[in-house]
Amino acid sequence: MEAANEVVNLFASQATTPSSLDAVTTLETVSTPTFIFPEVSDSQILQLMPATLYSGMNWLRDHLDGFSLLALSGCIFVSVLYLVHIIAFFYSIYRLHHKVEPDPTLPGVSVIKPIVGTDKNLYQNLESFFTSQYHSFELLFCFHSEEDEAIEVVRSLIKKHPNIEAKILFEGEPVGMNPKVNNMMPAYRAARYPLVLISDSAIFMRPDGILDMATTMMSHEKMASVTQIPYCKDRQGFHAAFEQIFFGTSHARLYLVGNFLGVVCSSGMSSMMKKSALDECGGMEKFGEYLAEDYFFAKALTSRGCKAAISTHPALQNSASVTVLSFFNRIGRWIKLRIAMMPHLMVVEPLQDCVTSGLIMAFGLNYLGGYSVYKTFGLHLFYWIVMDFSLMTSMQNGKFNFTPFLFVFIWLFREFTSPFIFIKAVLAPTIVWRNNKFKLSWGGRIRTSKNSQKVPEAVSLSKGAV
């Protein structure tokens, strides 16, 4: 209280000084003013506080019981989610869809494409890489088996584009329980260029996509990981619109805010890294024990002081076999992965969905101030859907190929089914991926289970580069 007394008394006290006659009696004498500070009690200090703050403290003391504190905390939590919407929208405008100019000084890129099976869009997706407008790159296609029907698709493209450096690598290398990492290992070892781009077979690449990612990579000397924010190429049909709306709203919101805050949220469907930086972390083989290898790539790099960022153009998923059921299974698999890697998300993740957060806000305000639950929940839904539509408009950067009515219908359906997807994922923690079943230990490591199918074994690179 001594410091507070000094501040108050500086303005409140009376000062006594020598008379002017005494001050001029001699030029050699300098009079120092003497201040007298009266004592001020704590109660007097409180009286100087703003009345609103003081009354607010009294209200909190008299009215904030346990349930009120819980309701207030819930309302604050949901208010933060409202802010997340705003940050995501404006950050998307700031970061996405910028034009990039060709730069021949950028490093070469080795594109690794792990492939299992085919669909009617595979040819289009793979050819988009053959036609990339980049001065120096190679394409490395990875297959577990020489019997894979997609091999003929790749061979036909290699024949059609003989000027593009491309290879087919078979059967992988057994470095862990993750079949995707095993599949990519020969390509990673054979990569000739400083930058490595891991791209899923269902990704359609814009002509300037590789250029965009390489430009972002070289924008900072410490940059070592660049990903494309997941989105979807325009396709016809309800199922495709369902997937596109999810990746343009709920997923995009968290991905953008995570990157804005510097949180690692890397997606492996289109991820570029500096090979030298990953080698310093132990190379790709070190991550064969993790199922979410993409996340742990970025985590290992950033833990060594490297930077991670998103490029300006989204990753355009273009699978021909998507259905609502397969989408639900995919989202459930991601939930299981996140919970295994970060167990605290088991509590936080379901609360940040639109429906659950709306109920928290509605009942919280009803308890604290008697506001209508229905009106509050309705306003919450309206705000959420308007902000989601605005964000998706920014992600799309053009016209939608579905009607606003379909957007509203799919959005409501997805939001109201989201809690059930989470519950199902928690109750059935085994992950089914391709033809394999996995169980994860805390931290994201793969552990074997009695019902696990055998992960395809791999052989050395000498078995084949075509």
From Swiss-Prot:
Q: Name one GO molecular function term.
A: ceramide glucosyltransferase activity
Residues forming the motif D3 are 294
Which top-rank group of organisms is this from? Eukaryota
Which Gene3D superfamilies does this entry report, sorted A to Z? Answer: Spore Coat Polysaccharide Biosynthesis Protein SpsA, Chain A (3.90.550.10)
Which body tissues produce this protein?
A: Expressed in excretory canals, pharyngeal intestinal valve, intestine and intestinal rectal valve.
Name any GO cellular component annotation: membrane
Q: What class of enzyme is it?
A: transferase
Its domain description in UniProt is:
The D1, D2, D3, (Q/R)XXRW motif is a critical part of the GCS active site, involved in catalysis and UDP-sugar binding.
- Please give the function described in this protein's UniProt entry: Catalyzes the first glycosylation step in glycosphingolipid biosynthesis, the transfer of glucose to ceramide to produce glucosylceramides (GlcCer). GlcCer are known to contribute to the physical properties and physiological functions of membranes and may regulate signal transduction. Only branched-chain sphingoid bases like 15-methylhexadecasphing-4-enine are used for generating complex sphingolipids in Caenorhabditis elegans. Together with cgt-3, plays a role in the trafficking of proteins such as mig-14 to the cell membrane in intestinal cells.
Q: What is this protein called?
A: Ceramide glucosyltransferase 1
Q: From which organism does this entry originate?
A: Caenorhabditis elegans
